[in-house]
């Protein structure tokens, strides 16, 4: 099977009350809210693209029919899993973070090529800063994800390509590292998470410092 034989949906989870930067999905860049810019960039890659959100305020900025309302959810993966029945026609569901302002097809393609052959794939760029989420990996497999300034690992990017059965089981998985509060750690111990290197030259909008 190759990437041309599978049906892919990009799904962007977006909550209104973000914890570190208030209502960041609605912050405007060049006159457009962040969520709309990320949505448009993904949509223009040629993939069916959706936003799953708890906010009518966010939903109104998205093409009619492509915003799906959810209840309260603990993280983005859980938000997608809560409305999985909306994506029955797709072979792969790609979770792209709504704060990835500079997302490009060049960033996404290595993840998609890998996930054709695997259950879960995510990605990294070489090197990391102390405040980055880090992935420690070996031979293409994730061993651990952490926010801690451990002094090693690579910068983890918030992109995940899932086979639907992973999302179907997500709420049943125990989180072996609850102190990290990282959604992907819940999958570790149940399934291998493949990691691939990619390129991402932009920012992720997480704090006020990222706005300048």
Can you say where each PLM-predicted feature lies in the sequence?
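Glycine-rich phosphate-binding loop signature in dinucleotide/nucleotide-binding domains
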Residues: 4, 86-91, 115-117
């Amino acid at each position: 099977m190759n990437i041309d034989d599978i049906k892919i949906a990009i799904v962007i989870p977006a909550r209104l009350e973000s914890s570190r930067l208030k209502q960041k999905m609605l912050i405007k860049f060049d006159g457009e809210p962040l969520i709309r810019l990320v949505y448009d960039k993904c949509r223009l890659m040629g993939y069916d693209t959706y936003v799953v959100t708890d906010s009518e305020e966010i939903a109104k900025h998205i093409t009619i029919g492509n915003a799906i309302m959810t209840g309260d959810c603990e993280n983005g993966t859980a938000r997608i899993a809560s409305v999985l029945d909306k994506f029955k026609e797709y072979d792969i569901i790609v979770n792209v973070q709504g704060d990835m302002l500079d997302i490009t097809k060049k960033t996404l393609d290595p993840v998609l090529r890998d996930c054709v052959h695997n259950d879960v794939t995510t990605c990294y760029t070489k090197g990391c800063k102390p405040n980055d989420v880090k992935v420690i990996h070996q031979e293409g497999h994730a061993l651990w994800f952490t926010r801690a300034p451990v002094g090693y690992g690579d910068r983890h990017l918030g992109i995940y390509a899932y086979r639907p059965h992973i999302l179907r089981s997500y709420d049943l998985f125990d989180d072996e590292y609850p102190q990290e509060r990282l959604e992907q750690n819940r999958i570790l111990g149940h399934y291998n998470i493949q990691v691939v290197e990619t390129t991402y030259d932009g920012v992720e909008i997480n704090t006020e410092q990222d706005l300048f």
